[in-house]
Each structure stands twice: as C-alpha cells, then as structure tokens.
Amino acid sequence: MPTLVVGPNWVGDMIMAHGLISFLKSKRPDDPIHMLAPSWSLEVARRMPEVDQVIELPFGHGELKLKERWAFARKLRFSRYHRSFILPNSLKSALIPAMAGIPRRIGWRGEYRYKLLTDLRILHEARFPRMIDRYMALGFPANLALSANQLPEAPLFPRLTTDQASQDRLVTAHGLDRSRLVAICPGAEFGPAKQWPIDHFSDLVTRLIDDGYQIVLLGSPNDADDSRQLTDQVEESKRESLVNLAGLTSIPEAVDVIGLSKAVVTHDSGLMHVAAATGRPLVALFGPSSPVHTPPLSEMAVTLTHPVPCHPCFERECPLEHQACLSELSVDEVFDAVSQQIQRIA
C-alpha cells in the first residue's frame, strides 16, 4: 500500500528528508512512496529515485482555503494511503492527510495539530540538533526514537540523481567546459547576514579563472542582481571564462550543472544541500547559521567561517553591523579550500 509524505517547503529541507525516504523504501521496497509538496521543493523530489510519484500542492504559501483543501484531499482518498508522514510543523500541512482519511498520520507536534495526527511526537531540539535526524526519527516507533544518538539506524546521506541528457543540453547551450568547471552560488535569500561580500567573490572568481577554471554562477531569480554585480567586478578580459546562469535554470538544471562541476562554493543555502547531495567537492561558507543544525551532508564537503564570539546568531541582518563571521573570512582561505577540494577528485 502506498505511503504519502507531506514534504517540506524549502529545497534544503526537502533534501534533508531524503534520509527518511530512502529508509522507508529500504524497509518496504514494493510500497510506493508519493511526495506531496509545493512546486519549488517538489522539483528536488523528482531527482530522488525512491519517490514513485510527485503531487504538487495546489495552494500558495499561507493560503488556507479549507473548501479547496477538502476537495483536494477527497481526490487523494482514491490512492488508499495506509500512512502519511507530515514533515512540516504547520497546521495546514496536517489538514490534507486528515481530510483524506489516511489512518496513520505521523509527525512532530507543531502548530495546533493534536487532533490531526494519530502518532504525535514531541520534539526535544537538543536531542535532535540536525534536521535530517528529526525527519528520520519519524520512521521509527516513538519509544525507539528518543534522540539522534539512539536511533536504530542512522540516516544515509541524501543523494540526488543527475540527468546526462540534460547535462549534455546545458553544456551545448551555455558553452560549459566539463573539464574545468567550478560552480559559484553567491546569493543569500535568507538575508544579507548570510552573504560573503560580493567583492570577495569577484576576487575568488578572478583567481580561479587565472588558474585555468571556467566559472558558472548559479542561483534563483532573487540572486540575479548579486551575480550581475559580481560579473561586473570581474575584469572584462576574463569574463569569457565566466558564465552567469543565476535565475536562468530550474532546480533540476542546477542539480545537473552542479553535477558537472569540479567544485562548488555556496553559502548555507538550498544549493549547498544540492551540491552535497550530488557528491561534488563543496566549500560551504557559514555566517550567522550553524553547521550543527543543517550541515552539508557529504564526505566531500568542508565548512568555513570566521570565528567570532557572537556566532551563531541566526539573524537575517547582523545586529552588530560588522558581519565579521563572513566579512573577515579571507579570499585566501576560501581559494585554498577550493583548490584542496578539487584535488580530491583530480
């Protein structure tokens, strides 16, 4: 019988859910897994081979629309789900499985969901500091999932598949050089406190180009201005080795470009988790956030930050107005880390 997973709203969190997904499939390989999520995070689930069907949530962020949710849930009844894992903590995310009459509905307590979940767990954050472990714990009976260290099985690192035909198209369309490609993701949608200075990025890009690499810039449409600013700061004669794709790729296409890269440089972002899940050498720059909660889950990843007493603060804007955790992280440190990471697959 099929299982319905109500997936997270954010790309990085969806990748963190892959540990649970792969675990569920390993225990019941013949049971289909259906993923319900918003379109932007659902694109990631399409690259998880354990997910048998993806279902787009037809409601915008914050929309309740009880009548429409009821009608949508009634359609899901025909799939005869025997259980549902509700990964977001919101009230809205638990409504549809309950309305669909799914008999087992498993999730953390969250937002006023007492009567909507049949297996309600109370989260002690200190016992489950990593998001991947919080999701994984839902796959076990509550009495076997008291802390991350006590889980009967540790979650596997997330893995996303790449599409070779898509990669070939991207190489041809944008003149990408598989032999020397380095992906840079300079955007920071969370807020400016998470962003390494653009002039640092432009210096890093220049040094990598001087070393013979081709640079591809990746990000969402919200990152396009930062990528244009970065491009403008690179000497014009060197821009033939710089391809700006920020805002021009879908999430699956970003997965495929990253899969072609010799190394990837990102902030703590959704694309950081994408890079980790493709297994590419990764340098992740952490500012106000902490790798304890949402680390890049890959043996090919290293994290960098500049140690300051106020780290981590988890603020969108630096309350002390110095952003030293990132601004004091030197180009030399990042360049050396990228060079060392590239050597790991040389």
What are these regions (language model features)?
Residues 1-346:
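Catalytic machinery of carbohydrate-active enzymes
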